[in-house]
């Protein structure tokens, strides 16, 4: 199973660098940035040994382009168990349950991480197959 990390409108270059570093530490390199902030020296410094993850990242204008080839789209959220006009929930799994479900799987997974201030929108969560 191939995992693509998708950062949706990241606000802070340091966070992009930190995600790239964490990705490399766990053996991932496929990063897609949806309408990102500028990534300059600080973001690259935070990436440390994972600078090539940032340099190889694909930058896209919309979420649809970022997830178009994915067989499974997984959204992340800190809000659980509510359905309101502002918070839409699709099937929810814990990180452990997701890992168990993905073991031995084939295809491509897009793992969406939302904005630092507002997370993923209701519309973006609706595009997900699973929420963690």
Task: Give the label of every model feature segment.
Residues 1-132:
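Post-transcriptional modification and biogenesis factors for structured RNAs
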């Amino acid at each position: 199973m191939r995992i693509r990390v998708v950062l949706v409108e990241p606000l802070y270059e340091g966070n992009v660098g930190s995600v790239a570093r964490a990705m490399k530490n766990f053996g991932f390199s496929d990063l897609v940035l949806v309408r990102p902030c500028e990534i300059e020296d600080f973001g690259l410094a935070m990436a440390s040994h994972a600078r090539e993850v940032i340099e190889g990242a694909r930058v896209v204008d919309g979420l649809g382009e970022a997830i178009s080839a994915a067989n499974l789209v997984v959204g992340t959220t800190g809000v659980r168990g509510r359905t309101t006009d502002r918070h839409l929930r699709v099937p929810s799994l814990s990180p452990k349950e997701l890992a168990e479900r993905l073991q031995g799987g084939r295809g491509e997974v897009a793992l969406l991480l939302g904005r630092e201030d507002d997370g993923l929108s209701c519309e973006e969560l609706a595009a997900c197959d699973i929420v963690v």
